Amino acid sequence: MKKIITLFSAAIVLLSATPSCEIREGGGDSPKNAVDLGLSVKWATCNLGASSPEQSGDFYAWGETTPKTKFTWENYKWTKEEKSSYGDVILLRSKYNSSSNQGTVDNKTKLDPEDDAARAKLGGKWRMPTRAEFQELIDKCTWTLTSQSGVDGFEVKSKVNENSIFLPLTGFYSQTDGYDGSTLHHKDQGNLWVSDMDNTYTVTCYFKKGKPGSWFGTSREYGMAIRPVSD
């Protein structure tokens, strides 16, 4: 009996040591799921919508707060349709735009809080990271290609205090390269949204084998994963 109890206790210890992502929607700040890497913000253990670090979580278009499984210009929240003088349908931008040729001009380059998926889903101090905060993660951490529970990704280990997070290779959704917007592709790489734009392009932190942490300018209607941060 003593041996059985010992084994059971060991199992409990093992399970409690396994990282989890129980950040509940609207649950506010959850310190046990915010990893202190000694940086300006704390990073979530998992992607938004994931229940373990190796899961991709949900996919979002930039500026949308509801996940989906098909990503096109036609179903993007901030697209508006107008007709040309020839009667053709033109897809224009209704928000986050600086070009009069592409729609309503507001010159916004950073997501409003109500358009931040992490803030909308989690509440509290959770939000999407800025490009500067991701750059800090790149500069002040060591990125090592590894696998966790059979999923490839990067261990991102702080040079400040040696704490770490795992970023899985997620792939993304788009209508490029012959895809229809509903097929997850480029699963050999990770792409995570940031909350601010680079001129007319939205930006993701991009990482794959041989490229541990760099930048990729992309189109806002693409479906990407999100790793929340907490102030």
Where are the model-predicted features located?
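Conserved positions within compact, well-structured domain cores
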Residues: R24-D231
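Positively charged n-region of N-terminal signal peptides that target proteins for export
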Residues: M1-I4
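Bacterial N-terminal signal peptides
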Residues: F8-S16
